[in-house]
Regions:
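Short, charged/polar N-terminal "headpieces" of proteins
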Residues: 1-12
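A short, structured beta-strand/loop element
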Residues: 13-50
């Protein structure tokens, strides 16, 4: 089974949050996309959800899911601060 932990954590600043949120792995990214994400539509958002799910199932790498998460952040104008 592929690892769902990222080589490097990300820190994102979501609207309305007082400080940055650290995202360390695919499961955490999936939760943030599903429960906290400010924009729940768009191609990059859908792809990020799909790649996170695939990584959790062992069907793609965590690094691929991380790239998809970063694309969703760009699409939603979510600041990546680290």
């Amino acid at each position: 089974m592929l690892s769902v932990t990222w080589d490097r954590a990300l820190a994102i600043l979501l609207p309305g949050m007082p400080r940055a949120m650290e995202i360390k792995d695919v499961r955490n990214a999936m939760f943030v996309l599903a429960e906290k994400w400010p924009v729940t539509y768009g191609r990059a958002f859908q792809r990020a959800l799909a790649f996170c799910a695939r990584a959790i199932e062992g069907k793609c790498s965590a690094s691929r899911a991380r790239l998809a998460f970063l694309a969703a952040a760009r699409e939603a104008k979510v600041a990546v601060v680290a």
